[in-house]
Amino acid sequence: MLSEVEFTEFQKENFSLLIDVRSPREFLHSHLIGALNFYALNDEEYQEIGMIYKKNQALAKARGASYICQNTAKHILEITQNFRIGEKVGIYCSRGGLRSKSIAVILSELGFRVVRLKGGFKAYRTFVTHYFENEINFDFFTLCGNTSCGKTELLEQLPQAINLEKIANHLGSSFGDILGKQPTQKAFEAELFHNMQNLENFAFIESESRKIGDIILPLKFYEKMQKAFKIYCFCSLENRVKRIQKIYQEKMTPLKFQQCVQKISPYISLNLRQDLLQGYERKEWQKLIVTLLEYYDKTYKKPDKIDLELNTDDILKAKEELLDHFKVQLLFFNIR
């Protein structure tokens, strides 16, 4: 069985397998969450067919069909070894054209229940873009407070939570670029959209600037965050230092530290810059961290309106206190 539906229906389906048939490079740039890449054309083939198409469309289609047949043969073998005939399979390509149709027809003939995404990945991106461009029907409860007061640690303990730093693969400050390569903007938005679709219409979230490393939060999303219920988190300096040391000490390299200090150099004195670099070289971790916290505390702007204050020295205790405060909302949605 083979059908084709709009994304609004496609996202409601419960697929045993979701296939992205675009080239590996396209897939890595961004894809539907949960999709596997069974490409119709690999990167080199896709580029070759594109160049031929500009000169001879008939030849491009013939050459492309040949490549698709070769690649599909390998993919079909892997799919039938890992999934039962009769299971539901979702499939999409770039615009809902030949690449997805060719593999979809074969899987359907084998007995899989195949659903194609009408308009392909382009239709999905249009849907996601419009979703974030419009007023978001979502309530946020925002954890704010000074650096390293346990906001992220608390967030990871909460139900109905969106961890923006995790999705962006960045810790959010000038020193936050220690986790490796960030996703593309499209991949970030795909993951954020997926997170929001799997929650009720509210979420706990950490206060962030609009820019997290190279990622930019969608404007309507950011504006909604700014208007959210504010939970001000605070804890002792001792615990803040411990948390910073736990997160950064193993991941921070000498070169990366120099680069991070360079980012804040326009805002600090030459003496402070030298103190930071020497502190790292001498491994005077606690003194170094306290110095950095003093810098960040001066730059932090406390919200004008705070709806709840929360001591986060003990994260589990803070979690229970917070959940107790929101028990009515959580009970309404049967969330524990």
Question: What residue ranges belong to the model's regions?
Answer:
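Long, charge-dense
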Residues: 116-129, 245, 257-260
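Conserved nucleotide-sensing/catalytic segment adjacent to the nucleotide-binding pocket
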Residues: 159-224
